[in-house]
């Protein structure tokens, strides 16, 4: 059995997952929370976006299960583990990890993108576009590439479609009520009847399964999105970057919420000098340039790691600490907007009759804020959280581009864009690294924004149907 390794970001991400599950169970037991989510469930576009988000979340969670593999021990004693820390996603994608080339190669290429030194049988050395070691290496004749790609794509798509068909059958069986015939259930799904848009959900899931099956079957024989300067598969780097984007978007929110909720409600409820102090605090914090503050924090972290190397023996642990520190700094600097919103809403709620009655009856201030004010501002919290998520994912890419983001050894879309900056200036242009980062980031941000729009419409009292 491998030895599990719990990085700080792993612990926090699973803590956040547990909090989400607990909130879901709590919401199912309370009608006033269940009703808005029921409205979200009726939105076809939101459910399609949720399917895409679940794919990203699944990849991120698999990449958050870290371990050290057990080394082979013939004697059966003194069990030892490898020094390298790998994730469950690394084990699943092991064929892609081990298939590194020498340097650049274009998508689906069989030859290198740049000329390399090759030694001839007579001892001479020449510069040529040599065959790749893994990409299309199974082809005896490179001219067979087009037909081979089409055949493997069709085979992978069929496998994905078969898995999707099993999923559809399972959904149909679970959707049956009483003695309903399966044909009747299938008819309701096909015509989009019922509160839950199962047709949209299943069609989106079908597209995902077919795409994953197609790409997986091709990726075992070709570099679908090419390779980078050091020969790493760009598709694999893009998939590994999902975890970084999700962590920056979620853990930053986890850090931001306590500051924003507590201080915002306190400022609006107590008013007076408490309101003045909190306003001066977030006004001063907003005046500090975020990039400069993050740069100073990252440099301070480098000094701390350099003086405490024994606490962080591996590159993965040092990179994880830098990622966690980046989330902390972003959380500390990004709570001011939500704090202002909650302060304004609390000022309005404080004048309501039920708040005045609770104060007159001698209810404690903490109890009033927890039981009467917080539930009435939760729609603002949820709306802000889902909208800020996509902005934080984009902000991480910007920070990595300017050199103050995550560690260079960490796979992230920002690091891919930063490395592609010089590649776009060369001739011929190496465009696939930038394109891959853009496509994966665009898919996550678009799905998050579409789902956020539905959540906003459902929880905003002014827009609630």
PLM region descriptions:
Residues 1-252, 256, 405, 409, ...:
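Gly/Trp-centered helix-boundary motif
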Residues 45, 170-173, 201-211, 227-465:
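Alpha-helical transmembrane segments of integral membrane proteins
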